[in-house]
């Protein structure tokens, strides 16, 4: 009740959804930094991917958008820094834009209009955060950090709105 429904974000996603010619592939559907095993000799090389229980067929860039929703970089504001659960803001780590560019380079796919996928990833995370916050408010999740998930959901919605406002889509 104290977390917005973000209807404007849902409508924007519906209106801006990429054309149907998207390449459908097997996607992990929970692809994020803490679900990969990196080569200790070459940290740009993934040698394992964990937790495949949510895998499905879909647009592979949705995996990237979802992954980057969790990606906190060094120049993010204090609120986002406080949400960090992965070492993505450590010195030498790629920024979100550098990850997007690297992905485009490695796949050969255009990442020019990535705003849709970035908003999608943030919106997806917002839904997860709202669900956990609701369980916390009802007494079904007790971790005190979950008390911050209501404000965090609002923050994610504001980030969506900022991306939507500057987007050329």
Task: Show the residue positions of the predicted features.
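Active-site activation/catalytic loop segments of kinase-like enzymes and analogous catalytic loops
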Residues: 62-107, 121-138
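Short, structured helix-loop boundary elements
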Residues: 3-10, 61, 146, 150
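An alpha-helical support segment within catalytic cores of ATP-dependent transferases
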Residues: 1-29, 39-45, 104-108
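All-alpha amphipathic helical-bundle segments outside canonical DNA-binding/catalytic cores
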Residues: 110-121
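Short beta-strand segments
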Residues: 26-32, 48-50, 118, 124-127
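Catalytic activation segment of kinase domains across protein kinase-like and atypical kinase folds
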Residues: 37-79
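Generic structural signal for small/hydrophobic residues in well-ordered secondary structure
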Residues: 13, 31-34, 64, 126
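Regulatory N- and C-terminal appendages and interdomain linkers associated
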Residues: 127-169
């Amino acid at each position: 009740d104290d977390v917005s429904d973000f209807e404007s974000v849902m409508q924007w996603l519906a209106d801006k959804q990429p054309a149907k010619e998207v390449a459908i592939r097997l996607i992990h559907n929970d692809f994020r930094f803490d679900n990969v095993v990196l080569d200790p000799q070459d940290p740009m090389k993934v040698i394992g991917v964990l937790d495949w229980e949510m895998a499905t067929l879909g647009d592979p860039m949705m995996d990237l958008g979802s992954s980057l929703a969790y990606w906190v970089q060094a120049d993010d504001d204090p609120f986002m820094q406080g949400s960090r659960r992965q070492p993505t803001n450590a010195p030498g780590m790629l920024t979100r834009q550098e990850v997007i560019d690297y992905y485009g380079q490695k796949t050969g796919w255009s990442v020019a209009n990535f705003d849709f996928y970035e908003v999608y990833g943030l919106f997806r995370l917002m839904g997860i955060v709202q669900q956990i916050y609701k369980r916390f408010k009802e007494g079904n999740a007790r971790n005190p950090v979950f008390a911050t998930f209501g404000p965090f959901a609002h923050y994610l919605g504001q980030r969506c709105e900022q991306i939507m406002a500057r987007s050329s889509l």
